[in-house]
Amino acid sequence: MEARTTDLSDLYPEGEALPMVFKSFGGRARFAGRVRTLRVFEDNALVRKVLEEEGAGQVLFVDGGGSLRTALLGGNLARLAWERGWAGVVVHGAVRDTEELRGVPIGLLALAATPKKSAKEGKGEVDVPLKVLGVEVLPGSFLLADEDGLLLLPEPPSGVRSGG
């Protein structure tokens, strides 16, 4: 990803912006890709199930309700995401294994880290519209992330490709 979210936001005013309240935990601070969505609460079984699919440069956006009590992604799932070709994962919630996450060469954003693991019951919804920080996150939209924030567009901007 070469273009900056600030420049693209100016060029595409129809884009939705999420402020950088997220912390970067992965090996890449800048990444972009088509969005897959997931809504869960303190249960990461569906996170694993989706990340086991071929990522093809997509970004998984996980709405964990902003809960910081349990981690929805750790080192094992981050490595799985990288091995399956995901460009990144955004977690509106917490992660763990932060030292391991830094070594995985994809974008990994979350609100915070916590040592506590999540439930594994498989509760949640896949590929549904999300509302995070007042912004609608739609499956199939295009997400660009860098140090200035996250930008959601209906289609990829000219010259921007998925990946890091």
From Swiss-Prot:
GO BP annotations listed: regulation of RNA metabolic process
Superkingdom, taxonomy of origin: Bacteria
Pfam families: RraA-like
Binding site for substrate: G74, G75, N76, L77, R96
EC number per UniProt: 4.1.3.17, 4.1.1.112
Keyword line: Lyase, Metal-binding
InterPro entries in alphabetical order: RraA (IPR010203), RraA/RraA-like (IPR005493), RraA/RraA-like_sf (IPR036704)
Residues given in the record as a divalent metal cation binding sites: D97
Co-factor note (free text): Divalent metal cation.
GO molecular function: 4-hydroxy-4-methyl-2-oxoglutarate aldolase activity; metal ion binding; oxaloacetate decarboxylase activity; ribonuclease inhibitor activity
Cofactor(s) the protein requires to work: a divalent metal cation
Enzyme class: lyase
Catalytic activity from the UniProt record: 4-hydroxy-4-methyl-2-oxoglutarate = 2 pyruvate; oxaloacetate + H(+) = pyruvate + CO2
Similarity comment: family membership: Belongs to the class II aldolase/RraA-like family.
Complex formation: Homotrimer.
Role: Catalyzes the aldol cleavage of 4-hydroxy-4-methyl-2-oxoglutarate (HMG) into 2 molecules of pyruvate. Also contains a secondary oxaloacetate (OAA) decarboxylase activity due to the common pyruvate enolate transition state formed following C-C bond cleavage in the retro-aldol and decarboxylation reactions.
This protein's name: Putative 4-hydroxy-4-methyl-2-oxoglutarate aldolase
Organism: Thermus thermophilus (strain ATCC BAA-163 / DSM 7039 / HB27)
